[in-house]
């Protein structure tokens, strides 16, 4: 994926609810360090039981499926987002998310 394009997509599609900064939770949990992290584990964020209990490790395949249709991939998630239909857009966002780390 194209991380630069993914950053713009992240800001327009996810930025209203998610921060890309470390430790900054908003409507949704901070997505800094999300790649390789287990679902439902950001300190200080009140997750749905569905996300806490899913124990998904966020990697290419899981992020791709979740971003395509969050409520299908994690039934009961409180993420009120229809999903991103274009695979290239999802892959570019994932490429950007991989850069959000120490």
UniProtKB/Swiss-Prot annotation:
InterPro entries: Cyt_c-like_dom (IPR009056), Cyt_c-like_dom_sf (IPR036909), Cyt_c_1A/1B (IPR002327). It is found in: Mitochondrion intermembrane space. SUPFAM superfamilies: Cytochrome c (SSF46626). Transmembrane segments: none annotated. Keywords: Acetylation, Electron transport, Heme, Iron, Metal-binding, Methylation, Mitochondrion, Respiratory chain, Transport. Residues 17-26 have a biased composition (Polar residues). GO terms for cellular component: mitochondrial intermembrane space. Disulfide bonds: none annotated. The modification N-acetylglycine is found at residue 1. PROSITE patterns: CYTC. It comes from the Eukaryota. The modification N6,N6,N6-trimethyllysine is found at residue 85. Its main location: mitochondrion. Residues 1-26 are annotated as: Disordered. Electron carrier protein. The oxidized form of the cytochrome c heme group can accept an electron from the heme group of the cytochrome c1 subunit of cytochrome reductase. Cytochrome c then transfers this electron to the cytochrome oxidase complex, the final protein carrier in the mitochondrial electron-transport chain. Belongs to the cytochrome c family. This is Cytochrome c. It comes from Euglena viridis.
């Amino acid at each position: 994926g194209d991380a630069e394009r993914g950053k713009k997509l992240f800001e327009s599609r996810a930025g209203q609810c998610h921060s890309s900064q470390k430790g900054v939770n908003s409507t949704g949990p901070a997505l800094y360090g999300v790649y390789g992290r287990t679902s439902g584990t950001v300190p200080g964020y009140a997750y749905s039981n569905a996300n806490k209990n899913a124990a998904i490790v966020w990697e290419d395949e899981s992020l791709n499926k979740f971003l395509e249709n969050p409520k299908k991939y994690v039934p009961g998630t409180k993420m009120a987002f229809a999903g991103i239909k274009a695979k290239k857009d999802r892959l570019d966002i994932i490429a950007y998310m991989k850069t959000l780390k120490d």
